[in-house]
Each structure stands twice: as C-alpha cells, then as structure tokens.
Design a protein with these regions (language model features):
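Alpha-helical solenoid repeat scaffolds, predominantly canonical TPR units
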Residues: 58, 103-104, 137, 144
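Periplasmic peptidoglycan-binding/tethering modules of Gram-negative envelope proteins
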Residues: 64-85, 110-115, 132-240
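Structural motif corresponding to the intra-repeat A-B loop/turn of tetratricopeptide repeats
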Residues: 49, 94-95, 128
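N-terminal signal peptide c-region/cleavage motif recognized by signal peptidases
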Residues: 28-30
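Periplasmic OmpA-like peptidoglycan-binding domain that tethers envelope proteins to the cell wall
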Residues: 246-316
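Single-residue signature of alpha-solenoid repeat helices
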Residues: 55, 100-101, 134
Length: 316
C-alpha cells in the first residue's frame, strides 16, 4: 500500500525543542563552559519564540564562541536551523506558498544542513519541475536522515517513504541521469542506493534505465543509468537480484508484457556483460503495475506515462 502523501504545507516531523540536538535542555552545558551556556539558552529562547533576527544573531556566534566544544557547536547550529524550519512550517500552515519561504530555507541551511530543509528544497524544485535539482535535494535529505549524528531522532517511516518516493520519481523524470551520491569517507553509495533508511528496508527501486521507443536499445540517459547500476552491483555483489520491466497503458496488454520482459532481459544481459555474476531474475509486468506515486496530481499525463515506463530493481 502506498504511504499517504505528505504535502509540503503539512508540518514536518520536528522533535520537541528539548530533544533538538540530543537534548540541549536536558544536557545543558556545564557552568564551566561560561558563555557557551548563555549562548545555548539564547538560541533555545529565540527558537521557541520564532524570533528570527535574534536567532540569526546568536547563530553567527556559534563558530567563534571559544567556550563551546566543537561537537556542541554542531548541536547548537542544528537547534538554530530548526528554529527557521519551525517558522517556515507555521507560515505554510497559515497558507503562505512554499516559494515565498526560499530565502528562509537558504538561511537555515547556511546555519546547519537538516533533512527538513533539504526535503522542502526538494519540494520547491519539484513544484517548479526542476527534476534534477529535486532529486539531489531529496537524496541529501535521505542521507541526513540515515545519519544518527545529523538526525538523532528519526522521522516517522511514512515521512521517509514519501521522500524516497519523490526522489525516485524526480530521477525518472530528470532530463539527464542523476547519479546516486557516494559517501567520500566510506566510499559507499547513498541516497537512492541505500538498502535501508533508519530501519525502513528499501525493497523496490525504480531505475531511470530508459529505452528508445518500442525498442530494447538504451537511450543515452538509460545507458548511464545501466552503467551506474553495474558499478553498484559489482561493488556490493548481492547474490541475486530481480529486474521487473514496466510499460505505460498505451498499446495492448500482451504487447506491453512482451516488451517489458524484453527490456528487463536487455538490462540483465548488459549487467552480465559488465561482470556481475549474481543470479538475475527478469519479469515483465507490462502495464499491470502502475507506479505508486507520492502525489499523482503533481504530474501531467505525459509525465505519468514516462514514470510508468521503468525497470525496477527488487531486493528479496
């Protein structure tokens, strides 16, 4: 079942103020930290009151306050950044458009990069049909959620699924192929390549492997996506995968099932040529399994057709 849509004007999950930054109130700085204690109190007060001018002034002091340990600076910055998000969500709930909040979003990210800000930036790009930028923002939100240091308290699973779904949709619609980000410390692929996000297991990933019309030949974007998938599989080396081809609802059901199966097989053959030795199952679903969209009203009929013409990677 598809998770319920989480519209951009619905308040994001933001932990209670006492839990922002791993409990800045419950674990206040010791008195020996001097001015850092005062700064923490000032930031919390301004965040509660949504006093953005005061919050901005206090946030500017975080990098240079000598009595604050470095790890505590990051927590303070996150509290200040989420103060902006709190105000933005109040404005959205009051009916203001998301586009009018862009400056505040940028100010929030300049203080600390939070998943809430990146998800809203993704929604903003999606509303403008800037699909490449939206994909990047949503993937960054997923990475931040998956990092317990950046996000001590994970959002509800439905929120994670919604962001993952929007990231997948935007990557399918982007004119150019958008690669998944790679963690430069660990070398592992993240974003839409994550197999789990804070306990939510990713079982199906729509791949932007596109084909020429009525053909099993990759488009330029499709070839890039197939190459990236091969690199990922060679590094991760899963013992088996399933590829499911899908089509839109134009044409006969039988023709679509045959074409979708042939396309899944074409991708499987390419992966074997690139050296992947795991077992590959291929299926052709034709038009029988339309993509479950986060919000169908966002898209034109042509875009929905494009979203349905996909190959899915299924993890068992």
């Amino acid at each position: 079942m598809a998770p319920s849509r989480i519209p951009s004007n619905r308040p994001f999950f933001i932990p209670p103020l006492r839990s922002w930054g791993l409990g800045l109130i419950l674990l206040a700085p010791p008195a020996a930290w001097g001015d850092c204690t005062t700064l923490a109190q000032d930031i919390q007060t301004a965040a509660r009151a949504a006093d953005l001018p005061a919050l901005a002034g206090h946030a500017r002091l975080i990098p240079t306050e000598p009595t604050c340990p470095d790890d505590y600076r990051a927590k303070l910055a996150r509290v200040a950044a989420l103060g902006y998000i709190r105000e933005i969500q109040q404005r959205l709930t009051a009916g203001e458009p998301l586009a009018a909040q862009e400056d505040l979003l940028r100010q929030s990210v300049a203080i600390a990069n939070t998943w809430q800000a990146q998800a809203l930036l993704g929604d903003l790009a999606l509303d403008r049909k800037h699909y490449e930028a939206a994909t990047l923002a949503f993937q960054e939100a997923l990475n931040l959620i998956n990092d317990p240091v950046d996000t001590p308290k994970a959002p509800p699973e439905a929120e994670i699924q919604s962001i993952f779904r929007k990231a997948s949709e935007c990557r399918l619609l982007a004119e150019r192929y958008v690669a998944v980000p790679v963690n430069h410390r660990s070398g592992t692929a993240e974003g839409l390549a994550l197999t789990a996000v804070r306990g939510w297991a990713v079982q199906r990933v729509p791949l932007p492997v596109t084909f020429e019309s009525g053909s099993t030949a990759f488009t330029a974007k499709g070839e890039q996506a197939a190459s990236d998938l091969a690199d990922y599989l060679l590094k991760q080396n899963p013992p088996d995968i399933t590829l499911v081809g899908h089509t839109d609802d134009r044409g006969s059901d039988q023709e679509n099932r045959v074409l979708s199966k042939r396309r899944a097989e074409a991708l499987a053959a390419y992966l074997r040529e690139q050296g992947y030795e795991g077992r590959i199952r291929t299926e052709g679903a034709g038009e029988s399994q339309p993509i479950e969209l986060d919000d169908p009203d966002r898209y034109t009929e042509e875009e929905i057709w494009a979203l349905n013409r996909r190959v899915e990677l299924v993890r068992r």
